[in-house]
Structures are given as structure tokens and as C-alpha cells.
Amino acid sequence: TDKEGASKHIEAGAKRVVISGPTKSDGVDTIVLGANDDKIEGATEVISNASCTTNSLGAVMAILDAEFGVQKSMLTTVHSYTASQAIQDAPKKDPREGRNAAENIVPTSTGAAIAVTKTLPQLEGKFDGISMRVPTPVVSISDVTAVLNKNVTVEELNNAFIKASKEPYYQGILGVSDEPLVSRDYIGNSNSGTVDLELTR
């Protein structure tokens, strides 16, 4: 969806339109819960809620940067396959996306890292990422590697996320887990993202 299409709702009388995904249109603010939702009152009439990956990362990156300072970071998201991919090998602009999504791990780009920097502009130039599309129907996992301004332990990192997850502000946005869960266990989970504490290094 672009600004032009979404603006038709404004012309029809809507006070605000939320694009429930990313947009490349100029003049559309990106608002993500847990990252920059405090700016919603002054945002453009048409706003973007970004992608599922961006929503899962927004609070995580905001907390990492606020608590420890992020110098540089890299994202690898292992993402369930999407409607943009082919179910059998076929020609596409991105040849990898044209390969059978149900039988391949498909490396591709992700706009999530750039979208996170739209919500957390202090991370611009410090955050990049790639995506691996895998043959699962739902749920994705994101692995973030970060160089921080402070030397920290695994316990300190996890405690920052545990503390944040208990704050009223992050309810329904950020969860934590110390259980040995897999993707299927997260189906129906209402958080934007859950930090798997057992995987912190």
C-alpha cells in the first residue's frame, strides 16, 4: 500500500489511516509500538505500522540502545515463507524468490533493519540485516548481533529484557522466555516479539 492509495480513506472522511505493513512512500511516518509510539500524536495522517519483523525488533533494539548503547548491529531473520514467493520454481525479478518456497531455505534481503532505523533514528547507519525464508507456515526468529558501548554479561542483558517485559508499557509488545520453545509454540502469542533468554550470548 502506498500513501496515494491510503489517502483515499482520508478523502472519504477517516481521520487517520494505518498501513498494516511497510511502505516506500515518502511523507508516511513509521510508528512501531515499543519503539516510537510516543510520536503518534504528531505523526502524519497516513502512518505505517511496518513489518512483523520490524515490530518484533523495535522494542528489543530500543532497550539494547537505551541500556547499553549500540555501536553496530546485524540482523539475520529466519522468516516463514510469504505470499511473494513461488510455490514451484518460476522466473522472478529476484531469482531466489522464484525458487520453490516449500522446499528451500531462501536467502534474501529484509527491509526490517532500515525500518527499525526509521523508528529509532539514532541507529541509522548502525543496523543492517538479511533474511532467510524457510518452509514453515508462520512465526519467525530474528538473531541480532550487536557491538555495544559497554561490556556486559549475558545475565545483565537478560535482566534488562526481563525488567522491561514486566513494565506496563511493554505489555503485549515484549515478552521473555526461558523455556525450550520452538516456532510452533508461539502460534497465537500476542506479543510483538519474545526474547529467548536461553539464546543470549
Description of each model-found segment:
Residues 69-72, 77-201:
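C-terminal substrate-binding/catalytic lobe of Rossmann-fold NAD(P)-dependent oxidoreductases
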